[in-house]
Amino acid sequence: LSTVLTVGRFSLTVMLFTLATCFGLGALIGKALGLNWKTSSLINAGTGICGGSAIAAIAPVIEATDMDIAYGLSATFLFDTVMIVVFPLLGRAMGLSDAAFGLWAGTAVNDTSSVVATGYAFSEAAGDFATMVKLTRTLAIIPAVLVFAAIQLHLKKKAQTNAPGVKVRLSKIFPWFILGFLAMSALTNLGLIPAAAASVLK
């Protein structure tokens, strides 16, 4: 946790900017391409936060269809495949340092496994830093899921207004797994869960 917080101090501004750009620009592009908001949101979440993990976390909250999820995963992993090959070449061409490339890869590449592959393809130091940046970026899943839960609740209430028979229950929309994630993180950092058990739970 301390390492993530240390890295976060240096990368937070960059990550916030890229997340805002990703969701803002992604929404406009999705609208221009005629994508529904669920498909567009999943692609944006996968691209901006944590690839398939973000899509898996947000999809049930917004009640995405299998097709929405398929489009989101396909777009995310397609971008990842290109980035793994192109980023190290561009990094060397631009003469980036290990830290600069690690920050770039950890912020821009989608999925965690792809970040690891891209970072270590450049250098070991870049791979180490990219991985920590990515782990910090992954924490954005928590507020993102809560925001999408609020959006879904708003849409449900709007539907209820138009169709009085529709019932809206916060308990069915709220992402309860977030509380479990936070509880396990707190217990692990307090040393209340043995390292062996923590590795199994992960």
What are these regions (language model features)?
Residues 2-10, 91-100, 120-129:
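Helix-coil boundary and interhelical linker segments in multi-pass alpha-helical membrane proteins
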Residues 19-31, 51-56, 80-92, 112-116, ...:
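Transmembrane alpha-helical segments of multi-pass membrane transport proteins and ion-pumping complexes
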